[in-house]
Amino acid sequence: MVLTGNELWSKVQQALQHNLSKPTFETWIRPAICSGFRDGELTLIAPNSFASNWLRKNYVQTIEAAAAKIYGQPVRVSVQAQEEDSAERVLPPMASAPVPLPAAEATTASAAPSSGPRRILPGLNLRYVFNRFVVGPNSRMAHAAALAVAEAPGREFNPLFICGGVGLGKTHLMQAIGHYRLEINPEAKVAYVSTETFTNDLIQAIRKDGMQAFRDRYRATDLILVDDIQFIEGKEYTQEEFFHTFNALHEAGRQIVIASDRPPSQIPKLQERLISRFSMGLIADIQSPDLETRMAILQKKAEQERMMLPRDLIQYIAGRFTSNIRELEGALTRAVAFASITGLPMTVESVAPMLDPNGQGVDVTPQQVIDKVSEVFDVTPQDMRSSSRRRAVSHARQVGMYLMRQGTDLSLPRIGETFGGKDHTTVMYAIEQVEKRLSSDPQLASQVRRVRDLLQIDSRRRR
């Protein structure tokens, strides 16, 4: 059979698409391109060195077998890496008004197909699967690493440490790993737990003299997914217990996946031995998505809601909300709800006033609150997180807690953790003090308004 390299690779891809899971195919096989076919050797180019190494280790034999079957002769496969460029993705054309999608089309955004009943553990969100994760340059490395861990737990990257800002998809990827393993083995012992839950379970075990049961529970897992590990900072006993849990699981070859808003080395008051353990596998960073990725995220969200939106509206929302995916999807949800309630068409002109920063306001990150309050009150972010009782620092810290309660979805305990481990009663007191002083202290009111303006927090927002 006479085939060019591109023709052979296209046929191999078609064959493998039926034999591999969709996440595997879309992550490893589809992005690879053929750069040549000579003397029985098919040369493939992967997007980056990470992908090329994974293809060589795990899929070269599968590709060679498929190629030989199609070509009629043995085929050798070599894989090279090409660093990813910023090629622009092109979105398909969209209608100028919202149109419900047929039910059959809407199924394309569903979770990965299941071959039978599956066991979903408490805490795993059914929406957080690989098929629903939109991959962009900001998240390609983390997504590929997560899929690699899901396919071969305990082998390549253990632990896998995913870090990135609020609302960028860390929890989605973590839980997608859990869902994937449960698809492969419904009896797998998968545990998804926040650091807060781990700490609370530990406290209860100490109180009830149940430490052995606590250890047995966590160390019997095949896969443990630990979210928000940054909140372990300063908790010496929790760190001690987590260190031994980590060692027990790692020595048994069990996969550990950890998520944080910052790399291990930047978590304050974290034991050096934990920093070392967390860094011994792979640290995968997720950045804020670029415009094209944000547009793709909105389009997929619209498909899941069975709506087609005007391209200019997608572009407007993607350009307006830039810091994280959570606020991006929230803006789309508000826009769809607004159009449904008012009966107005889904156009930029109709929804822009509702999404204006002087109206509802947008979500901000805890770090943004700390940075802007520090700027206005002339203190440092380190001062804000410290235990300093200097009047200027104390007042700035209280305002930071007050605005963090207004501008984020963090609970009182989480806000306290962000400010260096303060408890929730301290946060409540700070909020009450600021609310009292705002009506009688014009200078404070002016400073708070300035921070609000910088953060685009509306004074009418919740809490």
From Swiss-Prot:
Keyword match Cell wall biogenesis/degradation: no
Recorded GO CC terms: cytoplasm; plasma membrane
Residues involved in ATP binding: G167, G169, K170, T171
Main location class: cytoplasm
Swiss-Prot/TrEMBL keywords: ATP-binding, Cytoplasm, DNA replication, DNA-binding, Lipid-binding, Nucleotide-binding
Segments of this protein annotated with the region Domain I, interacts with DnaA modulators: 1-78
Stated role: Plays an essential role in the initiation and regulation of chromosomal replication. ATP-DnaA binds to the origin of replication (oriC) to initiate formation of the DNA replication initiation complex once per cell cycle. Binds the DnaA box (a 9 base pair repeat at the origin) and separates the double-stranded (ds)DNA. Forms a right-handed helical filament on oriC DNA; dsDNA binds to the exterior of the filament while single-stranded (ss)DNA is stabiized in the filament's interior.
Family: Belongs to the DnaA family.
Entry protein name: Chromosomal replication initiator protein DnaA
Gene giving rise to this polypeptide: dnaA
